[in-house]
Amino acid sequence: MAYTKISDVIVPELFNPYVINTTTQLSAFFQSGIAATDDELNALAKKAGGGSTLNMPYWNDLDGDSQVLNDTDDLVPQKINAGQDKAVLILRGNAWSSHDLAATLSGSDPMQAIGSRVAAYWAREMQKIVFAELAGVFSNDDMKDNKLDISGTADGIYSAETFVDASYKLGDHESLLTAIGMHSATMASAVKQDLIEFVKDSQSGIRFPTYMNKRVIVDDSMPVETLEDGTKVFTSYLFGAGALGYAEGQPEVPTETARNALGSQDILINRKHFVLHPRGVKFTENAMAGTTPTDEELANGANWQRVYDPKKIRIVQFKHRLQA
């Protein structure tokens, strides 16, 4: 019986783009438009070296009162102020042995099957990284205008009314919010309150949940805090389109295979360099030990500083309890 090796079925030139494309198709962050890229961010990520930060200058809005025109006074030129956002290139990788992929190797299209499993893995990892970043971002007082914490109040449960309160933390920019990320327990509570509608995608035919016309992303890696009295405090996040800047970098060797002769194992190695950045909150590197941040360092508020006006940051943190 012929033995199929990983190196026999993996063609890196085909495998790499397949994994990248499939990862974005599997992730609700990408499908809902929360994570979006642009030419500038892509170019910066491609040029960046290991662990490099990416500087993204921007122009502040023009402000000040208009000047009255008359025959005697000249207009006084006002300053146009610039600011700078900063993202970090995240470097990650993993390896899997032929034992892990044995069933997949025996299929009719093993490369696509393996690629789908690797893409699903990275979709989960990138979602986990986003929530680590948000934990760090919202641990700072400079994000107070984008936070609503009702968990300590008598009526601090997730409901239609409290959700509206959270949405309007952005004031007249509320309409920019297009999705909400929540724990499955929060989702269950919302379903029981008859707050969830399921909409069928016109292209894929897949039904996905929505709440007040906002797409729902359910993830059990969302924070849950248990207080001393046993009360659980849940964290949900509201997002706008493009709230996260996304770009793929260029690892020197994104995919390779290896052979462990002593263990009779083939090994698939996959590496990713990428940016997933909450736009408008600068990564400062103040508490980063290595060349690229760990999940714990991403969750450290010392590494983040708000630079955009609060209403321009299309993310709101909502802390609440659930209906008994």
UniProtKB/Swiss-Prot annotation:
The keyword Amino-acid biosynthesis does not apply. The keyword Ribonucleoprotein does not apply. Interacts with the scaffolding protein gp11. Interacts with the decoration protein gp12. Belongs to the lambda phage major capsid protein family. It is found in: Virion. Keywords: Capsid protein, T=7 icosahedral capsid protein, Virion. Signal peptide: none annotated. The gene is 13. This is Major capsid protein. One of its GO terms (cellular component) is T=7 icosahedral viral capsid. It comes from Bacillus phage SPP1. Capsid protein self-assembles, with the help of the scaffolding protein gp11, to form an icosahedral capsid with a T=7 symmetry, about 61 nm in diameter. The capsid encapsulates the genomic DNA.
